[in-house]
Amino acid sequence: MQYSPYVYYNEHCIVFNGEHTPMVINDSTFRKLFDFISQFPHYIIGSNADLPIVGGSILTHEHFQGGRYSFALNRAEVERKFTVNGFDDVECGIVKWPMSVVRLTGKNKDSIISLSSHILKSWRAYTDTKVGIFAETDGEIHNTITPIAFTKDGKFVIDLVLRNNITSEEHPLGVFHPHANLHHIKKENIGLIEVMGLAVLPSRLKDEMAILKDAILNHRDISAIPEILSLIHISEPTRPY
C-alpha cells in the first residue's frame, strides 16, 4: 500500500497486488475488499471495473483505491429495499444515485461476499434490448461492476455499481458514458472516484478556463479565438458569449 501522489481526497491510498496480474472483478475481489476494511475499518476501499471505458486508466495490474474519506455515494440513502432468498442476514437496497447502485449491508461479510458474487454473475449475463444493454456482442463482454466497501454503524457495507461499456456508431466512446456534447469537459474514463461522486477533471481545463475567463471579461467573441476552438474541439462557429 502507498499513498497517492495526487491526493484527490484525505489519505488517498492505492493498494497493489504483490503479483503482476490484470484487473478483474470476481469473488476474490470482494474478499480482498472486505479483508482490507476488516483491518482498517476507518477506511473505504474500492476497485475500478475490469473493462475499458468503465474501468480505470490502468487495467494491466490489479490495484485498489481507498482512503479516510466519506464520499457522497457513501452518504446517499437507499430509496428502495428488497430481499434475496437465502440471504436473510443481508440488507439489500437500491441507492438514490445517478448511477445504478445496489447496496448490501450486514455483519456477516461472507454472506455479503456470496451475494455480491451472485449479483455479479447475474449482471454479467443480463441483457435488456429496450434500454440498449447487451451482456456481450461478438464474444465481447460488456457488463461488470465497480465495487466499493466500507463500514457503517458496526456493519459491513458494499456498493455494487452496475457498469456497461457497450459502444455504438453514434457513441463510439460508450453509450453509457458522457456523450460528445460533453467531451470538451471530459471524455476520459469514468472511474471509481467519479462513480463515488468526486469529479476528477482533466488538467487541460485549467488552461481552457483561463482563456475563457479572459474572453468573457473582455467581451470577446470566443468563435474568433483559435486557441479556444482548438482546445474545446468546436468544428462549427460559436455564437458570441
How would you label these PLM feature ranges?
Residues 67-88:
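Helical (often loop-to-helix) elements that flank the catalytic cores of nucleotide-handling enzymes
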Residues 59-69:
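Histidine-centered catalytic micro-motifs
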Residues 222, 227-231:
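An amphipathic alpha-helical core segment
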Residues 1-49, 70, 91, 95-218:
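Catalytic residues for metal-mediated phosphoryl-transfer on nucleic acids/nucleotides
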Residues 1, 60, 82-83:
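Conserved alpha/beta core surface patches that mediate binding of polyanionic ligands
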Residues 51-59:
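Short, conserved secondary-structure transition motifs
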Residues 219-220, 239:
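Accessory, solvent-exposed terminal regions and/or long lumenal/extracellular loops of proteins
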Residues 232-241:
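Single conserved hydrophobic/aromatic residue that forms the stacking wall/gate
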